[in-house]
C-alpha cells in the first residue's frame, strides 16, 4: 500500500507531497494537478520509457530533474520507500537506473504493491464493441475493453458476474440486467466477431451501451474492474463522479467502501469536482489542490483547513465549498491568526441551503 507520494518538477508539481490512505479523493479546480498525481502513480508501475517524459515538462520549460518519491508498507507492515524516477526532463535518456524498473531491481514485493490501474473513462470507448481474441481481457485507460472484461467474467465466474450486477443495480436501480452478445462487425473490407454490451433497463430489453449514460458505463467499468480476477491493488479513478446523479455518487461510494472492507490490500485514489460526493467522505480522505500565482501546484489535506471551528460541524463537501482552495497556497508556517486575514466565510454567512441535516 502507498502511504505517500512526493512529486518534484512533474508537470505543475514543483514540490508536492501527498499522504495517501485506503481511500483518497483529490479535489480542486481544473488544471490544479489532480490528474497528474494519478498519472505519476501509474508511471511507477511500468518500466520507465522515453516517451513517458514527453508530457512531463511544464510549459515546455527545462525545470530541472523530475523526481517521484514514494513510500508505503507491505502486507506484513514492513515499510519501504523509493525514488522511482530521476531524469532530466528535456535532456537525454538515463538508462542505467535499475530502480526505474522495480522488477529489475529484484523487489517482487515492491512490484506487487504497485499493481495500479488508471481509469480516465471515455463513454464512447466504454460502449465500443471489442474484437474477440485469445488475449486476456484488459480494461484500458479509456475504458475500452469493457465488453470483453464483462464477457469473461460471465463465462468464467458466475458468482462475480452476479455480484457485479447487484452492485451496479445498487448504483443505477433502473438497470435490470447486463448482457454481452456476439456481433459480426464489417470494417474496411474485413469482418470479425466482437463482444457487444447490452442492457435491460426499466422493462426495455437489449438497450445498446452506446445509448446508455456515461455515468452508468463509468459505474459498470469501475465495479467490473474491482469484481474481476484482475482486480488491481491500486485503482486510480479520474473524475469519479462524472455523469452520475448525486445519489448515484453516494451509492457508488458505498459500493467502493464495501469492496475496501472485503479486500484489505485494495487502495483507491480518485479525483472529483463534486461537493455532493465529498460530503460522504471524512476530511482526512480529502486532499485539496490549487495553483499558486506562479502556476505550480499546492496540496493540503482538508483537515489542515484554517477554519477549525467548521471541522466537525460541516460535512466535508460543505466545508470545501465554504472555504474554497485559496488557503492551500498559504505557507505551513503561517499561523491561524494570520490566515484570518483571508477572511473565509463564517458559519453565520453560510446560507441554509448549504447545510443539510446529518
Feature locations, PLM:
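Pre-Walker A-like glycine/lysine-rich segment at the N-terminus of P-loop NTPase domains
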Residues: 1-47, 53-65
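Well-ordered beta-strand positions in beta-sheet-rich domains
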Residues: 15-20, 82, 206-208, 298
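Conserved beta-strand scaffold positions in the cores of enzyme catalytic domains, especially
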Residues: 17, 115-118, 286-288, 299
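Phosphate-coordinating catalytic segments in nucleotide- and nucleic-acid-processing enzymes
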Residues: 45-230, 317-326, 338-358
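The start of beta-strands in P-loop NTPase/AAA+ ATPase cores
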Residues: 233-234
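Walker B catalytic acidic pair
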Residues: 238-239
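C-terminal lobe/lid and adjacent interdomain/linker elements of RecA-like ASCE P-loop ATPase modules
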Residues: 251-358
Amino acid at each position: 500500500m502507498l502511504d505517500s507520494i512526493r512529486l518534484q518538477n512533474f508537470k505543475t508539481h514543483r514540490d508536492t507531497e501527498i499522504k495517501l490512505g485506503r481511500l483518497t479523493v483529490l479535489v480542486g479546480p481544473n488544471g490544479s494537478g489532480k490528474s497528474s498525481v494519478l498519472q505519476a502513480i501509474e508511471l511507477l508501475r511500468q518500466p520507465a520509457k522515453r516517451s513517458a517524459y514527453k508530457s512531463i515538462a511544464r510549459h515546455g520549460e527545462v525545470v530541472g530533474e523530475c523526481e517521484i518519491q514514494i513510500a508505503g508498507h507491505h502486507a506484513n507492515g514492513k515499510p519501504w520507500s523509493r525514488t522511482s524516477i530521476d531524469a532530466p526532463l528535456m535532456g537525454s535518456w538515463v538508462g542505467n537506473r535499475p530502480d526505474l524498473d522495480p522488477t529489475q531491481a529484484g523487489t517482487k514485493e515492491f512490484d506487487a504493491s504497485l499493481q495500479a490501474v488508471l481509469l480516465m473513462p471515455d463513454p464512447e470507448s466504454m460502449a465500443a464493441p471489442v474484437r474477440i481474441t485469445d488475449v486476456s481481457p484488459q480494461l484500458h485507460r479509456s475504458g475500452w475493453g469493457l465488453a470483453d472484461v464483462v464477457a469473461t467474467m460471465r463465462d468464467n465466474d458466475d458468482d462475480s458476474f452476479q455480484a457485479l450486477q447487484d452492485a451496479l443495480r445498487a448504483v443505477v436501480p433502473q438497470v435490470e440486467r447486463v448482457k454481452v452478445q456476439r456481433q459480426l462487425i464489417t470494417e474496411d473490407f474485413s469482418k470479425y466477431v466482437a463482444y457487444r454490451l447490452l442492457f435491460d433497463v426499466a422493462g426495455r430489453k437489449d438497450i445498446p451501451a452506446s445509448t446508455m449514460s456515461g455515468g452508468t458505463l463509468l459505474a459498470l467499468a469501475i465495479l467490473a474492474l474491482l469484481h474481476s480476477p484482475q482486480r488491481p491493488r491500486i485503482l486510480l479513478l479520474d473524475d469519479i463522479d462524472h455523469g452520475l446523479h448525486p445519489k448515484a455518487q453516494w451509492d457508488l461510494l458505498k459500493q467502493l467502501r464495501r469492496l475496501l472492507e472485503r479486500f484489505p490490500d485494495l487502495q483507491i485514489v480518485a479525483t472529483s469536482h463534486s461537493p455532493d460526493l465529498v460530503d460522504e467522505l471524512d476530511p482526512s480522505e480529502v486532499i485539496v489542490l490549487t495553483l499558486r500565482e506562479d502556476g505550480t501546484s499546492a496540496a493540503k489535506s482538508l483537515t489542515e483547513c484554517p477554519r477549525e471551528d467548521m471541522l466537525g460541524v460541516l460535512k466535508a463537501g460543505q466545508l470545501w465549498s465554504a472555504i474554497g482552495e485559496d488557503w492551500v497556497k498559504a505557507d505551513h508556517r503561517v499561523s491561524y491568526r494570520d490566515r484570518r486575514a483571508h477572511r473565509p466565510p463564517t458559519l453565520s454567512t453560510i446560507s441554509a441551503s448549504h447545510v443539510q441535516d446529518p
